[in-house]
Amino acid sequence: MDDQSQPGHPQPDSVAAIASLNDPIRRSLFDLVSHSATAVGRDEAAATLGVPRGTVAFHLERLAQCGLLETEFQRRTGRTGPGAGRPAKLYRRAAHSITVSVPDRHYDLAGDLLSSAIEESDRTGEPVRQALTRVSVERGRSLGASAGSLDAVLTFTGYEPLDDGDGGLLLRNCPFHALAVSHTDTVCQANLALLNGAADGADEREREVCFAPRDGYCCVRIARRAG
């Protein structure tokens, strides 16, 4: 998983991206581009759909702004140099996936942690559970250092932190809920290690990460340090 796909990095608004397809012209354009073997230009799209070129250009740009399409420039005449004309702006479906879940889930992050742990175990002979803890701590440190605070990591990663009234936080949502239900020990271990790493990376001094399972909440809570 590259850095731009990690929680804590700005991402296109997934809800807005999906909602943008509610417009019938925009949906038709997205389908046209998605099913094309090559990048599609504005003239081609307008001719195929029988829609004015200006309208097509507007909707293609909106789809690109939402992160559903990527753009490139090409000279389709095959000519180069002076007199070859301006390159045409072309569109193709974005390579990354856009998903929407309510509450927020990050199964991509869980899958990356588990895959990395297995690869490390195969490479070094380290037991998989130990590798998972280490990999999760390292990823958490990276997220904490990048976000600048533990609270930012919790928010971006979908934990839905709530003030517990005692200087700490309850985490209303588990970003790995379905996996945690099926593989509780493994996923909760990785979750705890991830947030311990995030606290360390963000240089969190006033609070600590605790394993405290509670119905309706994440298995981890953030507690005020004693003393």
Where are the model-predicted features located?
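Basic, Lys/Arg-rich alpha-helical nucleic-acid-recognition elements, primarily the DNA-binding modules
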Residues: 1-94
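Conserved segment of winged-helix/HTH DNA-binding domains
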Residues: 81-120
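A short catalytic or substrate-binding loop motif that flags glycine-/basic-rich loops and adjacent residues
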Residues: 83-84, 153, 214
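Short beta-strand micro-motifs in enzyme catalytic cores
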Residues: 87-91, 167, 216-220
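Short, charged/polar, Gly/Pro-enriched secondary-structure boundary elements
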Residues: 96-101, 176-180, 226-227
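Generic recognition of long tandem-repeat/solenoid scaffolds
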Residues: 100, 168-173, 220-222
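Mid-protein regulatory/catalytic core that forms ligand/cofactor-binding pockets
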Residues: 107-112, 116-210
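Short terminal or interdomain "cap/linker" segment that borders an active site or interface and mediates
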Residues: 205-227
